[in-house]
Regions:
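N-terminal charged helix/coil linker that caps or initiates catalytic domains
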Residues: 1-20, 53
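ADP-ribose/adenylate-binding Rossmann-like module
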Residues: 105-127
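A short helix-to-beta-strand connector/capping loop
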Residues: 82-88
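Conserved SAM/SAH-binding loop
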Residues: 90-97
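Alpha-helix C-terminal capping/helix-to-coil transition sites in glycosyltransferase folds
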Residues: 16, 101-104
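Glycine-rich phosphate-binding loop and adjoining beta1-alpha1-beta2 segment
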Residues: 40-82
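Glycine-rich adenosine-cofactor-binding loop
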Residues: 15-40, 44-52
């Protein structure tokens, strides 16, 4: 993938640590695809939900993604964007125990404020 136009803005080599995106819906799908376009080579994505038709207007997906698990659909889309990138799917609800096993960069982009608060507390504890 030719990164010559974006390398001055963002060098993917700075992300040597693991990258985790928790929630690949409205915000998470755009964050994921932006990182893939910027040349980040390995990203873990976490989501237990599937895309529905009403998601197409506010999430980085196409009609073909509807009724698919979010993580599976994003893997397909990311391969189209950058075939060299490795996207690792975790088709599950993330728990504080899962957070304890994570290292590196964590993008916490879940919808539920209760869940977000719970996971944020686990992230702070894990620092």
């Amino acid at each position: 993938m030719d990164l010559s136009r974006s390398i001055e803005v963002f060098n993917p080599e700075v992300l040597n640590d693991e990258v985790h995106i928790i929630g690949v819906g409205a915000t998470g799908s755009f964050v994921l695809q932006t990182l893939i376009r910027f040349g980040v080579k390995k990203i873990n994505i976490w989501d237990f939900d599937k895309y529905e038709a009403h998601n197409v207007n506010n999430q980085a997906i196409t009609q073909s993604c509807c009724e698919k698990q979010k993580v599976a659909a994003q893997i397909e889309l990311c391969k189209e964007i950058n075939p060299e990138a490795e996207v690792i799917a975790h088709d599950q609800l993330v728990t504080p125990e899962d957070i304890e096993k994570m290292s590196g960069y964590v993008f916490l982009l879940v919808d539920s404020m209760k869940c977000r608060k719970e996971l944020f507390e686990a992230i702070k504890k894990n620092e």
